[in-house]
Regions:
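Hinge/lid segment of periplasmic solute-binding proteins
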Residues: 46, 50, 125-179, 235-238, ...
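Extracytoplasmic "Venus flytrap"/periplasmic binding protein-like
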Residues: 82, 86-156, 191-193, 294-296, ...
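A structural signal for short loop-to-beta-strand junctions that line the ligand-binding cleft
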Residues: 113, 118-123, 149-189, 221-222, ...
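Extracytoplasmic/periplasmic solute-binding protein
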Residues: 166-175, 180, 204-256, 260, ...
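Extracytoplasmic/periplasmic substrate-recognition and gating elements
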Residues: 192, 277-280, 319-401
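Glycine-centered hinge/linker elements that transmit conformational signals in sensory
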Residues: 207-210, 252-285, 348
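Long, aromatic- and glycine/proline-rich binding clefts that accommodate carbohydrate-like moieties
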Residues: 340-346, 396-450, 454, 461
């Protein structure tokens, strides 16, 4: 049996690298903050759409992306090819810049520092890079092009508009959105006497379920847990707790960290308790690592908190072993004899209630140093992505959540959620996005890499080295505050 598990792990490990590199996913200055992304009251720059009409030949647009692979990368390539074939005024070249969003950002920042003529016309970067992008002054807000083209931004999910808005202006032309969810093995739940259709709703319930799974001898360390700032942020934001000042950086430039609160201390203490009781297998957030996925696939663990984009990969991992009906909402106990891994997805287990998340993911940003015709051509591609048929392709084929509201009403999308294993696994994340509170869009932080490093270092100090939670968080908070203040002074 263990040999079979190992073989499956080897088959899926390459595909899982992509999901591991794509955290749900930021650019110094004073360009705050948020709104509903309708542009009302905001002063927008001109979007040079007329330049495309005046161009002597096709605009040549370069798109930089990275951190995606498999069906997600293929979806992007297909959309670009379809766009190029649909008209003769713009030719887009999509260029893969690396295995992670961080690598793309490093190349973008290097080009910006050396010679802006080396920059692409569109760059796909995580939401964590949005503040520094805006403050760097290199991005044409797509809201300006939406206004010039007559596109109604309220067609986009409110929580997405809010999360990717700065100073009441929506910046990306398209957004690939994901959120944190709970993956679990329904077969393990059944063997432990748990209801396979009732995943834990809170972190406390997750602890209780992990004890039941361990005591039943079903899995060695029931929860596979990657140290992740995104998970911790969502735990706090779900309780209305900001990680930085000025309303999480949305009312003004963040200058002070605020996450060392009792709720954060209690959360880390509970995770440490799970370590002490052998209920959790903790992994560092190393770029490209897939070990936390493999713990679920090899059945050393029964549960995993990860980004919803992993749904497609997990569905591929078990393709041929079971059907969507067997792993779906109407779970059949007989499949325990047919498959070792019966994946399910639950809402993100919060501190007090489930599904309390803010959107993560990556936006497609128009670079304003490009010639006007190329900026107009860049918008043409992104407007093409916003068409319901292409937004639907990102969901059905690329594993991202539908951001154009009308997509959810499409019959083939609803069939996907019912009949396709990937769709069954994605549906809880879709529901989370639809229910997400636009007034809790997550933080805007300029030196986001410093914030991530300090917060995750504190988590690792507690979970690996038995550091005292309150002290570790206080030290991290002081360090992040220093980074925020230096950023504000630059």
């Amino acid at each position: 049996m263990r040999q079979r598990h190992a073989a499956l792990a080897l088959v899926v490990s390459a595909a899982l690298v992509t999901a591991a590199c794509s955290d749900p996913p930021t650019s110094g200055g004073d360009a705050a903050r948020t709104g509903d992304g309708d542009g009302e009251g905001a002063e927008l720059p001109d979007c040079p759409l007329d330049a495309l009409d005046e161009a002597e030949g096709p605009a040549e647009v370069t798109l930089w992306y990275g951190g995606i692979g498999g069906p997600t990368k293929q979806t992007l390539e297909d959309i670009v090819a379809d766009f190029n074939a649909s008209q003769d005024r713009v030719v887009v070249t999509a260029s893969d810049q690396g295995s992670s969003f961080a690598e793309v950002n490093r190349k973008f920042e290097s080009a910006a520092s050396a010679d802006t003529s080396q920059l692409p016309d569109i760059v796909m970067l995580e939401n964590t890079q949005m503040q520094s992008l805006v403050d760097g002054g290199l991005i044409l807000p797509a809201e300006a092009c939406m206004e010039a083209a007559g596109y109604d931004p309220t067609q986009i999910e409110p929580a997405v508009r809010s999360a990717f808005t700065v100073d009441d202006v929506f910046y990306p032309g398209y957004v690939n959105v994901s959120s944190q969810v709970l993956y679990y093995n329904k077969a393990h739940f059944l063997k432990a006497g748990l209801d396979p259709e009732a995943p834990p709703q809170t972190l406390e319930e997750l602890y209780d379920v992990a004890r039941t799974l361990r005591d039943a001898g079903v899995s060695d360390e029931p929860l596979s847990f990657k140290v992740s700032h995104a998970v911790f942020e969502n735990w706090l934001s779900g309780e209305g707790i900001d990680v930085v000042d000025n309303a999480n950086g949305r009312d003004g430039l963040a200058t002070e960290a605020t996450f060392a609160v009792p709720e954060a201390t209690d959360t880390l203490a509970l995770l440490r308790k799970m370590v002490d009781e052998g209920l959790i297998n903790v992994f560092s957030n190393a770029e490209g690592s897939v070990d936390h996925f493999l713990a679920l696939v090899t059945q050393d663990s029964s549960m995993l908190i990860e980004t919803s984009t992993a749904s497609t990969t997990i569905a591929q991992a078990v393709s041929g072993q079971l059907t969507a009906a067997e792993a779906g909402i109407d779970f059949d106990a007989s499949v325990v004899d047919q498959a070792d891994l019966v994946p399910g997805t639950g809402l993100f287990p919060g501190l007090s209630s489930p599904g309390q998340v803010h959107p993560g993911g990556a936006g497609f940003f128009i670079v304003n140093t490009s010639p006007p015709a190329d900026q107009a051509g860049a918008w043409a591609l992104l407007e093409f992505m916003l068409q319901p048929a292409n937004a639907k392709a990102w969901h059905l084929n690329g594993g991202y959540l539908p951001i154009v509201k009308s997509v959810q009403d499409e019959p083939d999308v609803q069939a996907f959620w019912q009949d396709d294993l990937a769709g069954v696994l994605l549906k809880p994340a879709v529901d989370q996005l639809a229910d997400a509170d636009p007034d809790l869009p997550g933080p805007l932080i300029g030196p986001y890499p410093d914030f991530i490093d300090d917060l995750e270092d504190a988590m690792e100090a507690v979970l690996f080295d038995d550091a005292e939670p309150a002290g570790a968080l206080a030290d991290a908070q002081d360090s992040v505050t220093g980074s925020l203040q230096r950023y504000a002074e630059d």
